[in-house]
Curated annotation (Swiss-Prot):
Belongs to the thiolase-like superfamily. Thiolase family. One of its GO terms (molecular function) is acetyl-CoA C-acyltransferase activity. The keyword Transferase applies. The active site is at C86 (acyl-thioester intermediate), H338 (proton acceptor). It is an enzyme of class 2 (transferase). This is Putative acetyl-CoA C-acetyltransferase VraB. Keywords: Acyltransferase, Transferase. The lineage of its organism: Bacteria, Bacillati, Bacillota, Bacilli, Bacillales. One of its GO terms (biological process) is phenylacetate catabolic process.
Length: 379
């Protein structure tokens, strides 16, 4: 079987909903990343077999193909867009790696993009062509049958209650995320991930959701979103805009082209769970991944779990017995942000730049009751 390696990875800084990137369509968010790869890896770009991107709340119309054309890549390069909700970006990386393993191609660009600010409004179509009632807008599509399709906030509350994750633990984890993120922005670790872009004449190179100077006590002052609950705006991620691209190729070709380091894809798993508890998906996903590769949690140096809500990450940490020295060691989405279709690819990008780590996992909890996880080693 061929081996797939990630040899390059970059992302935009993530803008908050209605923030600096609010006027940019998904293809415009991706364009500078494509152009960066085109300029830096010109010889490789001509060999691309496919572009695979995750996207969740966009306009449809295969954003992967549209974006590569917008960026001036060759007409002969195809593109495919994947929607596995929040797991789309990680799914895109796994898809490209699996295609290389299967011998279907040798060079792929994978990643994801999301503009929550530019997401189209959704209106239910009337049952009758003679309908006279006012249009009915809705926030999102259904992820599961009606009685098993909680809002994401209610889903986080369900997980918190089931796994006994207190408000205090949630706030403490959120504070940790902001502190670790701020620390790794300051020391330059996170800046390695980010390609600075120019937006309206200004350089944009810092995640907008980060609140590095909020005192710990302030997290406890936020009211729960649901009366009597524990999930607040402070221990939940924000809605965000941003894009991520990774260059993935067959290992022997990577060596031939002069790439000397990166991530080797070992395996990936996707599972289903009770859709009332969507955030717990990483638990069986990571467990199955470890079992299939004859590993234990202690064998993994770094585990990146997307921080949609403190409640679900703390629950996963406790269920899997993950130590703080393993989990989200540069912070996470509670501070950096969660651009849905790009977030899984961002986790892999973060692992790519942890040059001193050898064995790593990226995992996502997914709306509708899913979880995915991927195992990487350094090459």
């Amino acid at each position: 079987m061929n081996q797939a390696v990630i040899v390059a990875a970059k992302r935009t800084a993530f803008g908050k909903y209605g923030g600096t990137l609010k006027h940019l369509e998904p293809e415009q968010l991706l364009k500078p990343l494509f152009q960066h790869f085109k300029e830096k890896y010109l010889e490789v770009i001509s060999k691309i077999d496919d572009v695979v991107l995750g996207n969740v709340v966009g306009n449809g119309g295969n954003i992967a193909r549209k974006a590569l054309l917008e960026a001036g890549l060759k007409d002969s390069i195809p593109g495919v867009t994947i929607d596995r909700q929040c797991g789309s970006g990680l799914e895109s990386v796994q898809y490209a790696c699996r295609m290389i393993q299967a011998g279907a191609g040798k060079v792929y660009i994978a990643g994801g993009v999301e503009s929550t600010s530019r997401a189209p409004w959704k209106i239910k179509r009337p049952h009758s062509v003679y309908e006279t009632a006012l249009p009915e807008f809705y926030e999102r599509a259904s992820f599961a049958p009606e009685m098993s399709d909680p809002s994401m906030i209610q889903g986080a509350e369900n997980v918190a209650k089931m796994y006994d994750v207190s408000r205090e633990l949630q706030d403490e984890f959120a504070y940790r995320s902001h502190q670790l993120t701020a620390e790794n922005v300051k020391n330059g670790n996170i800046s390695q991930e980010i390609l600075p872009i120019t937006v309206k004449g200004e350089i944009f190179n810092t995640d907008e959701s980060l609140k590095s100077h909020i005192p710990k006590d302030n997290f406890g002052r936020f009211k729960p979103v649901i009366k009597g609950g524990t999930v607040t705006a402070a221990n939940s991620c924000m809605k965000n805009d941003g894009a991520v691209l990774l260059l993935i190729m067959e290992k022997d070709m990577a060596y031939e082209l002069g790439f000397e380091h990166g991530l080797l894809f070992k395996d990936g798993v996707t599972v289903g769970v009770d859709s009332n508890f969507p955030g717990i998906g990483p638990v069986p996903a990571i467990s199955n991944l470890l079992k299939r590769n004859q590993l234990t949690i202690e064998n993994i140096e770094v585990i990146e779990i997307n921080e949609a809500f403190s409640a679900q990450v703390v629950a996963c940490q406790q269920a899997l017995n993950i130590s703080n020295t393993q989990l989200n060691i540069w912070g996470g989405a509670l501070a950096s942000g969660h651009p849905y279709g790009a977030s899984g690819a961002q986790l892999v990008t973060r692992l790519f730049y942890m040059f001193d780590k050898e064995t790593m996992i990226a995992s996502m909890g997914i709306g509708g009751g899913l979880g995915n996880a991927a195992l990487f080693t350094r090459f």
